[in-house]
Amino acid sequence: VYVDEFVGHDMETRLTLENDFDRVYHLSADVPNSKGVGGSQLTTGRSNPIQTIQALDFAARNKSHFIYAVSAMIYNTEHQGHNGPDLNEQEHIWPANPAGNIYGMEKLYNMQLAKEYAKAYDMKISLPIFHAMYGPHCDILENSKVVAAMCVKIFNAEDPGEMEIWGDGTQLRSFCYI
């Protein structure tokens, strides 16, 4: 399998490819949001850790570098909305109190699990933490994240008119174009 080949697979079941892989990228997750898109809290809380365990097991068997996409939702709720470049794991995640829902908690759990796999299987891991992702393939009608939500507000605003911007003006945001 080459980097430009897509392998469709239900990640809740064991991946049985018989190839050497330098890297395993685990970049997606089922994300519940305010518009009911994706699974329920229970569905995502069950499904995402299972998928991560399957990906970690595969990477461990293949001695692959494991790259897991972590979400800014892992940060303690006191630091949500202030996700600038000064955030760090020890000061802003612990004590654990992820924002919003089970999604942040399971992302934090999966990140910690990857660290344990790295120790147990002598694996190399990378854990990039992404903030506010957006791009041409994001469906603004089905995504309640800040960029999509602001686009919907702009489209629905009267001309000329006003629209509400959330927050008190002190929040910092990091955006990731995908």
Q: What spans do the regions from the language model cover?
A:
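NAD(P)H-binding glycine-rich loop region in Rossmannoid oxidoreductase-like domains
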Residues: G8-P49, F58, N76
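SDR active-site strand-loop-helix element
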Residues: V24-D30, F66-A72, P128-F130
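NAD(P)-dependent short-chain dehydrogenase/reductase
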Residues: Q80-L87, Q112-I178
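Residue-level detector of structured alpha->beta connecting loops
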Residues: D20-D22, K63, D122
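Conserved Rossmann-fold NAD(P)-dependent oxidoreductase catalytic core, especially the SDR/UDP-sugar
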Residues: I53-I102
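Active-site helix of classical SDR
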Residues: I102, E106-Y109
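Conserved cofactor-binding/catalytic machinery of classical short-chain dehydrogenase/reductase
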Residues: R23, Q51-Q54, H65, Y109-N110, ...
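N-terminal Rossmann NAD(P)H-binding glycine-rich loop of SDR-like oxidoreductase domains
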Residues: V1
